């Protein structure tokens, strides 16, 4: 595959709620672009992008997969992402490095919870998007109702570029509002054959109405196009497409297309829209460099434009360990890099040498000798590069804008079934945690148990299954536990003196530290305010280390302590007896004493819960959620069903699905995702502390 110009590259993601048809759509794209010669199906377990054993067994996407295809002289790099909330890290890191996205919306249900979550992530990274309303062949599918949910739930200007012809099993094709024609798919040949014809008479009036809306909305972003429209009463197709592309990239509106990927209708025009409306790397202003410490994240900063004749820069966004070694997926933002070259990991401050470079096609790979700005490739040979690290030329050692990762909310204890497997289990878990930034691994300092923290029960179940399959380690697993955290609610200044004398050289260190609460998700922040050398510079990192190590075990119930700032403002040292170890010990002890006086609190994860229930069970569902300490947010009726939205502590949601099925005779369903951490009520805190004592 030859290297196209930057203007002819599209880096896109395909994302949606689980079961909306992401992988099915990707399979059709690969078939119509000639990459694959047969169409894989999720239910048959033979799709290209769902290549892990667990994905094929369960019929769900677990890890994002990168594939490359060509369409009309353009290269499209596609990442197919998971739809289940437990694997949201894959969507997060993919959207971070992509230039555009296709959001697939189910034609029956419309916008669903995970679509909303992914949409907010795309908003965070300013990713241009087109929307594909899928599954219009299904019983109950309604393009116009699904379209209304785009405006209601996503609060966007949704702009139809197509209208459906027929509905449910009579869905035949689409009205193309840009070129004002009908596109009809013929039977056979897996949807590869279709033809244009005049718009059906019964749709002519509606098509004219929607065409006028398209012109009014799209041309408003392009003064020259609007002027042409006023002069001639219409615009040519190229002018209209140019205006749609501009409005798509700047987010003024979101183009909407439709079809049914499973029945092979609508995918080729979707591919055309990727070429016509989603940006090439050169259409975007370039990625921002990271904010300096203390700098406002929203401030204007230098951007790295997509150019091949510039110093190399790239972002590592995914790590995979397989039988061949470690693969590091990198989005290249500028420059050229060849196998054998050396680059700087500017995040960590060390050199890396590039071994081999691969273009990935799901789990298959093709070796290439070099990568250019705009490419997505996998590197072999990197020793210490993790997700979110920047790789850059030594001529311009930039650090690119960092990635944000979700907070794990569920803990399990893990131990191997045999003592001989301890080392193998630890190595396996470390490698899996290196691949997945939403997975945390720690050792309980009191019990010595290995604690694994993840996004949900399915997430952790998959990790343990991978440990067994890939590392040949069977484990005993503790019952899932809520991943509580601790924090403080007020400022406090603590002085601690560590003094130990028992013959020979002793230990001495004194620290004076201010502990202050921070907002949620701000982590742990250290500031050195020592003046006059009361604590020598070489000992200050030891104080920082001591606090951070001790913060893993909070003062109330032993949970990790988060969201606080500690400032070293003074201290004392001894010329002979002071050492880094003495100051680390002093930092740990100062934390233990100071935190007790800073209003310590236990935090619990609060989940966004959505329950879809028949009308006659609403009272039971709402009453039950209230008993679970839930806060009802709102209720939406749709025909005979009601959607109940609530925020409920995760602690109260274990075993909920069985109870919900029993309460509604199996007719209700629910989804749940993490929203925020909140202090627990006093009675719950007492219960937690009693259990941990």
Curated annotation (Swiss-Prot):
Q: Which UniProt keywords apply?
A: Cytoplasm, Elongation factor, GTP-binding, Nucleotide-binding, Protein biosynthesis
Q: Do you know which PROSITE patterns this protein is assigned to?
A: G_TR_1, G_TR_2
Q: Which GO terms describe its biological process?
A: ribosome disassembly
Q: Which GO terms describe its cellular component?
A: cytoplasm
Which GO molecular function annotations are given, in alphabetical order? GTP binding; GTPase activity; guanosine tetraphosphate binding; translation elongation factor activity
List residues traversing the bilayer: none
Q: Gene3D superfamilies recorded for this chain?
A: 3.30.230.10, 3.30.70.240, Elongation Factor G (Translational Gtpase), domain 3, P-loop containing nucleotide triphosphate hydrolases, Translation factors
Which residues are in the tr-type G domain?
A: 7-282
Task: State where GTP binds.
Answer: 16-23, 80-84, 134-137
Instruction: Identify the PANTHER family for this entry.
Output: RIBOSOME-RELEASING FACTOR 2, MITOCHONDRIAL, TRANSLATION ELONGATION FACTOR G-RELATED
Functionally, this protein is described as follows: Catalyzes the GTP-dependent ribosomal translocation step during translation elongation. During this step, the ribosome changes from the pre-translocational (PRE) to the post-translocational (POST) state as the newly formed A-site-bound peptidyl-tRNA and P-site-bound deacylated tRNA move to the P and E sites, respectively. Catalyzes the coordinated movement of the two tRNA molecules, the mRNA and conformational changes in the ribosome.
Indicate what this protein is called per its UniProt record: Elongation factor G
Which organism is the protein's source?
Answer: Granulibacter bethesdensis (strain ATCC BAA-1260 / CGDNIH1)
């Amino acid at each position: 595959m030859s290297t196209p110009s930057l203007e002819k590259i599209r880096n896109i993601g395909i994302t949606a709620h689980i079961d909306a048809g992401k992988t099915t759509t990707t399979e059709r794209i690969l078939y119509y672009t000639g990459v694959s010669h047969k169409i894989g199906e999720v239910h048959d377990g033979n799709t290209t992008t769902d290549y892990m054993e667990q994905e094929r067994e369960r019929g769900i996407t677990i890890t994002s997969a990168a594939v490359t295809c060509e369409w009309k002289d353009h290269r499209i790099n596609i990442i197919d992402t998971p739809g289940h909330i437990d694997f949201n890290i894959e969507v997060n890191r993919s959207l971070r490095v992509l230039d555009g996205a296709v959001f697939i919306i189910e034609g029956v249900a419309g916008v669903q919870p995970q679509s909303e979550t992914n949409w907010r992530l795309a908003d965070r990274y300013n990713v241009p998007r087109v929307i594909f309303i899928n599954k219009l062949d299904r019983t109950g599918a309604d393009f116009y109702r699904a379209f209304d949910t785009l405006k209601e739930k996503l609060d966007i200007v949704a702009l139809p570029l197509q209208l459906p012809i027929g509905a449910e099993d009579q869905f035949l094709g689409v009205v193309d509002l840009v070129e004002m024609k009908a596109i009809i798919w013929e039977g056979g040949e897996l949807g590869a054959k279709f033809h244009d014809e005049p718009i059906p008479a019964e749709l002519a009036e509606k098509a004219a109405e929607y065409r006028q809306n398209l012109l009014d909305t799209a041309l408003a972003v392009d003064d020259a196009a609007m002027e042409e429209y006023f002069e001639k009463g219409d615009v040519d197709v190229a002018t209209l497409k140019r205006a749609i592309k501009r409005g798509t990239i700047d987010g003024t509106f979101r183009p909407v297309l439709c079809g049914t990927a499973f029945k092979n209708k609508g995918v080729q025009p979707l591919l055309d829209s990727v070429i016509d409306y989603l940006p090439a790397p050169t259409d975007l202003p370039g990625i921002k460099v990271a904010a300096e410490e203390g700098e406002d994240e929203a401030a204007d900063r230098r951007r790295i434009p997509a150019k091949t004749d510039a110093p190399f820069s790239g972002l590592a966004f995914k790590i995979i360990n397989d039988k061949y070694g470690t693969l590091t997926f990198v989005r290249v933002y500028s420059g050229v890099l060849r196998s054998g070259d050396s680059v700087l990991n500017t995040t960590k401050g060390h050199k890396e040498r590039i071994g081999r470079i691969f273009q990935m096609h799901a789990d298959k790979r093709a070796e290439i000798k070099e990568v250019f700005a705009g490419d997505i490739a996998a590197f072999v040979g990197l020793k210490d590069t993790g997700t979110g690290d920047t790789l850059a030329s030594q001529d311009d050692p930039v650090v690119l804008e960092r990635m944000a990762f979700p907070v794990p909310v569920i803990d399990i204890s893990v131990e191997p079934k045999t003592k001989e497997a301890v080392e193998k289990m630890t190595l396996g878990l470390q490698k899996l945690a290196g691949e997945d930034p939403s997975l945390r691994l720690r050792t309980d300092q009191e019990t010595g148990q290995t604690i694994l923290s993840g996004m949900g029960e399915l997430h952790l179940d998959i990790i343990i299954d991978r440990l067994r399959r890939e590392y040949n380690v069977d484990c005993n697993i503790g019952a899932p536990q809520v991943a509580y955290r601790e924090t403080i609610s007020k400022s406090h200044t603590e002085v601690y003196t560590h003094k130990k004398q028992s013959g020979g050289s002793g230990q001495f260190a004194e620290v004076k530290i201010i502990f202050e609460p921070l907002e949620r998700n701000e982590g742990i922040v250290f500031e050195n305010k020592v003046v006059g050398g009361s604590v020598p510079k070489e000992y200050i990192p030891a104080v920082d280390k001591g606090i951070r190590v001790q913060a893993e075990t909070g003062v109330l119930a032993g949970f990790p302590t988060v969201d606080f700032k500690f400032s070293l403002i003074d201290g004392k040292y001894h010329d002979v007896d002071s050492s880094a170890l003495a100051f680390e010990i002093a930092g740990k002890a100062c934390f233990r004493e100071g935190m007790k006086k800073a209003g310590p609190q236990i935090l619990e994860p609060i989940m966004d819960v959505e329950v879809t229930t028949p009308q006659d069970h609403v009272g039971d569902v709402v009453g039950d959620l209230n008993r679970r300490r839930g806060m009802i947010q709102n209720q939406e009726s749709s025909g005979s069903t009601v959607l109940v939205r609530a925020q409920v502590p995760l602690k109260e949601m274990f075993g909920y699905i069985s109870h919900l099925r029993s309460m509604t005779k199996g007719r209700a369903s629910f989804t749940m995702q993490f929203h925020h951490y909140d202090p627990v009520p006093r009675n719950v805190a007492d219960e937690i502390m009693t259990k941990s004592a």
